[in-house]
């Protein structure tokens, strides 16, 4: 009877697991306030798949923009390619569990507030002890017009995880939080398919079309601004419509845009685009385009007017060079004198320490000699006691040991001259003219200052003459590429 009850208890314990292997399950995808269920996942092929509408995802973005002053384009821009995280980072804890963090870095190295931040990390809330996630090689996603297909492969169905998808060009990021659940009775409705028949492809590479974009920028500002392009991000985005962008007419400081949409309703398009985005109907149309170009971060500032000098600056340069030379010479002389004085004092202190160490070594050597004499005296006494047996060594049947203490090294240490006489502290010349040390150092400093002053007097006029004739040698070539009448 007891065996029957034990078998029955084990059957009821493992019955849900056995039945669960054959029952279909799916993953629920929560985005903001909406939930999306994946297709049924079975143990034979554990794959969770979603077909998501990008416009519905944009409407469900409940997070705040992650960066301050982030430029918001979600009200009038087209869809952009989505990027999943290329790798996962394992972060274990002390209890044997832990988290998986998904890490993503944008290849263009974008920084806030330019259309999103550079990198994001999101915790993976599954257990680390037995992870069923198979990392990046099992992530599959495609984008068809405004719909996104995501396929996540697992080694077992019904496992919770968290996923973060970053869409460059959108103001909020998407936090996709998934959890295992049973198949719902009815599939939640998605928004109807949008009329976005085409998406805007990324622009032609900058290697061949950068000059055309700069020309369009100059033409849109009527050739009154200087365009400075930041080479940190050499990539353009989409054709957008931004009628509220204004170019500064007169300003002392350039107006910096994190990303600028230049209005181009009456300009010839530099590239052949067959479809454009209409912000009024929120759709891609093939009618004449009234759009703009999105360029990387650059600054617009008025062209400065070059004024002629009213006075020559050569006397100022002469006085400036002379003052700098004299100041450098005085500072060098003072520094040299102080360094020589400090070197002398340092050598004196080191020599004093060496003499004390030498006295200590000599004293220890004398003590060692006394100990050796005491040992020899004891040895002679023991030899007399064991005279009949042939001495101490034969009585002990051991080899005789003798001391060999030399005094040559100690005598050489005592005969060495002082350290100040062995170290070269001056210029390597004999400056002993019957003067004191400070007088000799002052003489050396004066000679140095005179040499520097002579060098400035001899080489200064030649250098100033060359600098004066340098502006006349510079040529300003005229580039026809920025001519307003040139065709794009």
From Swiss-Prot:
Residues 341-387, 397-429 form a coiled coil. GO terms for biological process: fusion of virus membrane with host plasma membrane; symbiont entry into host cell; virion attachment to host cell. A lipid is attached at residue 462 (S-palmitoyl cysteine). Residues 1-20 form the signal peptide. The chain crosses the membrane at residues 443-463. InterPro entries: TLV/ENV_coat_polyprotein. Residues 21-442 are extracellular. The record marks 312-313 as: Cleavage. Specific enzymatic cleavages in vivo yield mature proteins. Envelope glycoproteins are synthesized as an inactive precursor that is N-glycosylated and processed likely by host cell furin or by a furin-like protease in the Golgi to yield the mature SU and TM proteins. The cleavage site between SU and TM requires the minimal sequence [KR]-X-[KR]-R. The CXXC motif is highly conserved across a broad range of retroviral envelope proteins. It is thought to participate in the formation of a labile disulfide bond possibly with the CX6CC motif present in the transmembrane protein. Isomerization of the intersubunit disulfide bond to an SU intrachain disulfide bond is thought to occur upon receptor recognition in order to allow membrane fusion. Keywords: Cleavage on pair of basic residues, Coiled coil, Disulfide bond, Fusion of virus membrane with host cell membrane, Fusion of virus membrane with host membrane, Glycoprotein, Host cell membrane, Host membrane, Host-virus interaction, Lipoprotein, Membrane, Palmitate, Signal, Transmembrane, Transmembrane helix, Viral attachment to host cell, Viral envelope protein, Viral penetration into host cytoplasm, Virion, Virus entry into host cell. Residues 376-392 are annotated as: Immunosuppression. A motif (CXXC) lies at residues 225-228. One of its GO terms (cellular component) is virion membrane. SUPFAM superfamilies: Virus ectodomain. Disulfide bonds join 225-228, 225-401, 393-400. A motif (CX6CC) lies at residues 393-401. Residues 464-488 are cytoplasmic. The surface protein (SU) attaches the virus to the host cell by binding to its receptor. This interaction triggers the refolding of the transmembrane protein (TM) and is thought to activate its fusogenic potential by unmasking its fusion peptide. Fusion occurs at the host cell plasma membrane. The 17 amino acids long immunosuppressive region is present in many retroviral envelope proteins. Synthetic peptides derived from this relatively conserved sequence inhibit immune function in vitro and in vivo. The mature envelope protein (Env) consists of a trimer of SU-TM heterodimers attached by a labile interchain disulfide bond. This is Envelope glycoprotein gp62. It comes from Human T-cell leukemia virus 1 (isolate Caribbea CH subtype A). The lineage of its organism: Viruses, Riboviria, Pararnavirae, Artverviricota, Revtraviricetes.
């Amino acid at each position: 009877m007891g065996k029957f009850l034990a078998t029955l208890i084990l059957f009821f314990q493992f019955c849900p697991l056995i039945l669960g292997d054959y029952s279909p399950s799916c993953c629920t995808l929560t985005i903001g306030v909406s939930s999306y269920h994946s297709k049924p996942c079975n143990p034979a092929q554990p794959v969770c798949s979603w077909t998501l509408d990008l416009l519905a995802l944009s409407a469900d973005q409940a997070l705040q923009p992650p960066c301050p002053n982030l430029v918001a384009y979600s009200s009038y821009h087209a869809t952009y390619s989505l990027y999943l995280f290329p790798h996962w980072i394992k972060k274990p804890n002390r209890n044997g569990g832990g988290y998986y963090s998904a890490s993503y870095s944008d290849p263009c190295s974008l920084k806030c507030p330019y259309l999103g931040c550079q990198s994001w990390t999101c915790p993976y809330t599954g257990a680390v002890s037995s992870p069923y996630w198979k990392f990046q090689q099992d992530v599959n996603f495609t984008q068809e017009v405004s719909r996104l297909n995501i396929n996540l492969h697992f080694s077992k169905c019904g496992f919770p995880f968290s996923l973060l998808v970053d869409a460059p060009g959108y103001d909020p990021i998407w936090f996709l939080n998934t959890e295992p659940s049973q198949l719902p009775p009815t599939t939640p409705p998605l928004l109807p398919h949008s009329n976005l028949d085409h998406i805007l492809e990324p622009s032609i590479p900058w290697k061949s079309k950068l000059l055309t974009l700069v020309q369009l920028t100059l033409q849109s500002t009527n050739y009154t601004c200087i365009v400075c392009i930041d080479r940190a991000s050499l990539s353009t985005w989409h054709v957008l419509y931004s009628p509220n962008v204004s170019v500064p007419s007169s300003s002392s400081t350039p107006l910096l845009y994190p990303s600028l949409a230049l209005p181009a309703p009456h300009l010839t398009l530099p590239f052949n685009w067959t479809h454009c985005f209409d912000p009024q109907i929120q759709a891609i149309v093939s009618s004449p385009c009234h759009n703009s170009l999105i360029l990387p971060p650059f600054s617009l500032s008025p062209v400065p007017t070059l004024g002629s000098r009213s006075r020559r600056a050569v006397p100022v340069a002469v006085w400036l060079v002379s003052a700098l030379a004299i100041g450098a010479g005085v500072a060098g002389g003072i520094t040299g004198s102080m360094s020589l004085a400090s070197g002398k004092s340092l050598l004196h202190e080191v020599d004093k320490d060496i003499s004390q160490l030498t006295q200590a070594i000599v004293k220890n050597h004398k003590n060692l000699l006394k100990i050796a004499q005491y040992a020899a005296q004891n040895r002679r006494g023991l030899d007399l006691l064991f005279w009949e047996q042939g001495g101490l060594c034969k009585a002990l049947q051991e080899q005789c040991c003798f001391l060999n203490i030399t005094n040559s090294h100690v005598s050489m240490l005592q005969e060495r001259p002082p350290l100040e006489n062995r170290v070269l502290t001056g210029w390597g010349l004999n400056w002993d003219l019957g003067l004191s040390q400070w007088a000799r150092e002052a003489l050396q400093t004066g000679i140095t200052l005179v040499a520097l002053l002579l060098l400035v007097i001899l080489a200064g006029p030649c250098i100033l003459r060359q600098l004066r004739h340098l502006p006349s040698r510079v040529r300003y070539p005229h580039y026809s590429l920025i001519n307003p009448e040139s065709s794009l």
